[in-house]
């Protein structure tokens, strides 16, 4: 049995998922306009394990969003994940937030451009091909209706 605790705190959403052999068995999440990661993250983790009657010691690994995203949110999620991994002697799996968003979409050809609010009128974005290979590195940029004109013309 492979049991992975998944932590996402890169955006205003705070979510924790417990997956067993690749299938979600329990989830807790909140999406608000205010960041509540510090208050909710550890409570959510405790609730998942109470609901499933599993123990932290049953974990095979912990996966955490590595960003890009909210600096404070990422620090909260990564710190919690690293602390648990150290205490439990399990591997830490860092996952690219934009790649996760890209993998929610299936295309035969073309480019996937996931974006996350970077504040100050900017977005974090990267380009992925249909096989989810990153073809342009992550950047924070201000976009407008003409920002990706050269891509849409190809």
Regions found by a protein language model. Give the residues of each.
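Residues at secondary-structure transition points
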Residues: 32-40, 71, 75, 79, ...
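DPxDG-like acidic metal-binding loop motif
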Residues: 61-92
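Phosphate-handling active-site elements
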Residues: 50-57, 86-97, 107
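Ser/Thr-centric signal marking residues that sit
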Residues: 9-11, 72, 97, 154
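Short glycine-rich anion-binding loops that position phosphate/pyrophosphate groups of nucleotides
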Residues: 12, 67-68, 118-121
């Amino acid at each position: 049995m492979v049991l992975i605790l998944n932590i996402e705190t890169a955006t205003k959403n705070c979510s924790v998922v417990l997956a067993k052999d690749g299938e979600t068995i329990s989830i807790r999440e909140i999406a608000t306009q205010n960041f509540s990661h510090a208050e909710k993250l550890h409570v959510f983790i405790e609730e998942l394990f109470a609901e499933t009657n599993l123990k932290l010691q049953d974990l095979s690994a912990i996966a955490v969003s590595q960003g890009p995203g909210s600096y404070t949110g990422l620090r909260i999620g990564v710190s919690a994940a690293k602390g648990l991994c150290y205490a439990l002697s399990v591997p830490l799996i860092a996952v690219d937030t934009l790649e996760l968003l890209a993998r929610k979409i299936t295309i035969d050809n073309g480019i996937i451009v996931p974006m996350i609010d970077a504040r100050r009128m900017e977005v974090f974005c990267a380009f992925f091909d249909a096989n989810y290979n990153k073809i342009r590195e992550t950047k924070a940029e201000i976009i407008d209706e003409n920002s990706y004109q050269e891509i849409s013309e190809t």
